[in-house]
């Protein structure tokens, strides 16, 4: 084969290869049709995901550049203002300003706003609410080693040292309060036993011995004893309600709902007052002595918080009150000690105080609560030996040998939790209905005394009728349920039938639950924790007796079930796990930890399934603001944009002083949002109200001072010049008169010639500038009448200007035109009248003619015609700025000097006052100054937070709730790409039905 043939064959093979490849591809495509996954992929590949050809990369870069550098028109001055706010020098000025304004009414309103006036949320994490001296924990080094007194004083002035002194003092005072209440209750219990001593055998003796039960039910009741019992209860209930009606109505109830609201950031000043403390203690003691089914835990916690607030009002601990964060920590310590003074459980008391009242808790501050609780517990246990004979015992011990738990026992614990959870939910439902029923009718709402008398009467009758076990105090009944023996005395004798044992406990449970629901609704001081603990113990004892008799349960004794159900019923009502801890401390049985926790968790879950907790329900009914942790499913579908307030009032960096003053007069906001400009609406920060008021006052004072200095300096010099000119004019007039007389005596012809020459000169001279008051006077005799009319029309306040042309001068005299400098002198009266002006003009004319001086106004030789009085002025008033011309006259020569008036008055680097702005007063000067320039001038500091709390407008509402609860926020701003679009306050979230 030749070379040419080979090339042809290669070309044919190469031309046929594409056909073969295409056939192979077709075969592959035929096989791919039956592959659904590949078909779907090919379908998505054909979709145009960017039909509008949007440059996403460029858009992303634009958004990133927006957040990093702001908008394109954000000028350099704004950046300079922000950098100045962040400088250390400006922060030092902020500290000095804060020390000046912290005693003002506006600044105190940021933390002392009364709830009765307005709901004002306190942002306890905002740096504007803290005293800068409280932020430093380290003690500054004192170089002078000899000043030990100064060093010790500085050391004591720190927040940490004052806290260490405050906490033990608080714990001791609360423990003493608990001891006093125990002593009063013991004495009142003894008095009650004494007045009912006719059948005292039915009451459990205080010496611990077991009474002998009577043989029949009828022997357990006596008419006289019943009347005395009921009268005793009604009398002390009357004293309790009188404390509310006549001392302080804020002591009503347990006080825990109010403390929850206070710990949320709401200021309730009267709730923590001294009158409330007296009413709370006296009312609680009397209500407990009356035999009403109420508890002491809530009132103790409320009273402890009041003691803490009163201690912080002392000058020694004044630094603690200034810092909101430390103040809330001390309130938590007080609430903890209140629980310890009631139950003697420091660990459970701290957890209970945090879980019940606080929305958030800083774990690093728990040591403060433990320190206060330990101090109270030490005094509490030391005092128990003294008051061991009383009816009230805060610690209940029983003998229990732990055994192994089986699956059946665990199921039993869960079953008890379910039952206690259902009972707790039903109790909350009944409580809400009773409170709303009372509030529905005005007669029940207003007649406190009558309502308490009626309810206490029926409560005493029911309590006495329910048997001896229901008549004893709650702590004594708790000791009976946790004991190894049967609860005594009985309403029904056990020897008649074994079911009477269950019936006794069932009667106690039903009676106490009903009485608790009715008694805690009354307007008296009283809580519900202790009745739940005792009733739960009775319920657990009933379960334990049934399991022991019918199912031969040996793992846990009936007393153990009493402790388990006690924690379960409390958790099912208030929906907290912490009661399980202090129940363990009450009983001293840590072996029951797992059963109690199982029961408490189950009870809490069951109760939450039906309704809100007891204290949250009370908050909702009372209308107290509080962010509850129990919210509906709406918060997961809504955004911040749907709940924000859109019509927000703000100021910008370009706002003038007038606008800022009007804003402060119109709105009483504690914090004011600041944006860069009304067009961009970029949030720069927030400003404290009192700081802005202080800044405006300082700025206005500085500007007014500069204006007064300028006016006083100028007018003094001007008056001196006027006096000198007048004296010189008088001397010149005298000299001219003498010269004229001599000339008349010597040569009459020459005198006549001189007079003619003087007249010609006066007629030919068109204009003459006189530097007496900085104005130009008309010397033409033909215009004297017009000048007089001009003076009369302007009341000698303004002087007309002279133009080169006679017609122009006359028109100006009629028009009353004056220079800007003359406008400044409107308030000053000139000392020159018309006659003085005429004499001065003649004197100058004679002087110029006699001395042979050239006239001030130069004339052209060609235009020296009487009909054409066109002259070229030496100084053109149209082209030059106003000048101050001072004339110094002597006997031989007259010299004229010109001193230019400065265009602006220098104030500082940011402001220069224009002469034109002075004619309308100081407000026309400082009223136009803007906020950015005032900050840049550095006259005084502005308390400004450059990083306020803000959330995007599409943030889920659930996250917004978490931010408010975890950070303790009072408000947060809503932004869209950095622009301020709205605000969300804590009150607005509280008002939402979520």
UniProtKB/Swiss-Prot annotation:
Q: Which PROSITE patterns match?
A: CBS
- Location (main, coarse): membrane
Q: How does this protein sit in the membrane?
A: Multi-pass membrane protein
This protein's GO CC annotations: chloride channel complex
Acidic residues bias: where? Answer: 859-870
For this entry, the protein name equals: Chloride channel protein E
Q: Which residues lie on this side of the membrane: Cytoplasmic?
A: 1-163
Q: Which keywords does the record carry?
A: CBS domain, Chloride, Chloride channel, Ion channel, Ion transport, Membrane, Repeat, Transmembrane, Transmembrane helix, Transport, Voltage-gated channel
Gene Ontology terms: biological process? chloride transport
- The UniProt transmembrane annotation reads 164-184, 227-247, 271-291, 300-320, 334-354, 362-382, 410-430, 449-469, 505-525, 527-547, 554-574
List the Pfam families hit by this protein, alphabetically.
Voltage_CLC (PF00654)
Q: What InterPro entries does the record point to?
A: CBS_dom (IPR000644), CBS_dom_sf (IPR046342), Cl-channel_core (IPR014743), Cl_channel_volt-gated (IPR050970), ClC (IPR001807)
Family recorded in the similarity comment? Belongs to the chloride channel (TC 2.A.49) family.
Compartments reported by the entry: Membrane
**Role of this protein:** Voltage-gated chloride channel. Chloride channels may have several functions including the regulation of cell volume, membrane potential stabilization and signal transduction.
Q: Which residue numbers delimit the CBS domain?
A: 644-705, 944-994
Q: Which GO terms describe its molecular function?
A: voltage-gated chloride channel activity
Listed Low complexity bias regions: 11-32, 717-764, 809-822
Q: Quote the CDD domains the UniProt record gives.
A: ClC_1_like
Task: Give the organism's phylogenetic lineage.
Answer: Eukaryota, Amoebozoa, Evosea, Eumycetozoa, Dictyostelia
Report residue spans for region: Disordered.
1-33, 715-767, 802-822, 846-872
